[in-house]
Amino acid sequence: MLKEFKNFILRGNVLDLAVGVIIGAAFTALVKSLVDNLINPLIGMFVQSTALAHLSVTVGKTKFTYGAFLNDVINFIITAFVIFILIKFINKLFPKKEETVEEQKNEELETLQEIRDLLKKQ
């Protein structure tokens, strides 16, 4: 059982996933710092608040902190955009080689012609 576990852990996909999770966590902290320390103060200058996350509205005895939600939305948008750009960059570096439909048809046609020629010889 230990050998199976070792083989499972050392497979490329599992290691890639582990590295991705670790880098993702570090990147999330970086984006959070960017939003909290640079973007929020800029927005705060326009909404007369020290931090976007502290914006709230009180209805009755209930306090709705919509600023915290907006803060998380900004974090998500920045993270998603950077991941999108990263994936586009990686796809350009390592393009998938896909045969076009025309190439596939040409190969099929060549094979059929070879079969036809062999049948004619018989």
Swiss-Prot record:
PROSITE patterns noted in UniProt: MSCL (PS01327)
InterPro entries (UniProt xref): Mechanosensitive_channel_CS, MS_channel, MSC/AndL, MscL_channel
Topology of the protein relative to the lipid bilayer: Multi-pass membrane protein
Annotated transmembrane regions: 14-34, 67-87
SUPFAM superfamilies in alphabetical order: Gated mechanosensitive channel
Pfam family, one: MscL
Localization in the cell: Cell membrane
Keyword flag Protein biosynthesis: no
Chief location of this protein within or outside the cell: membrane
GO CC annotation terms, alphabetical: plasma membrane
The entry's keywords: Cell membrane, Ion channel, Ion transport, Membrane, Transmembrane, Transmembrane helix, Transport
Domain of life: Bacteria
Keyword Transmembrane carried by entry: yes
Gene Ontology molecular function: mechanosensitive monoatomic ion channel activity
Quaternary state and interactors: Homopentamer.
Described function: Channel that opens in response to stretch forces in the membrane lipid bilayer. May participate in the regulation of osmotic pressure changes within the cell.
Family: Belongs to the MscL family.
Name this protein carries in UniProt: Large-conductance mechanosensitive channel
Organism: Lactococcus lactis subsp. lactis (strain IL1403)
Gene that this polypeptide is encoded by: mscL
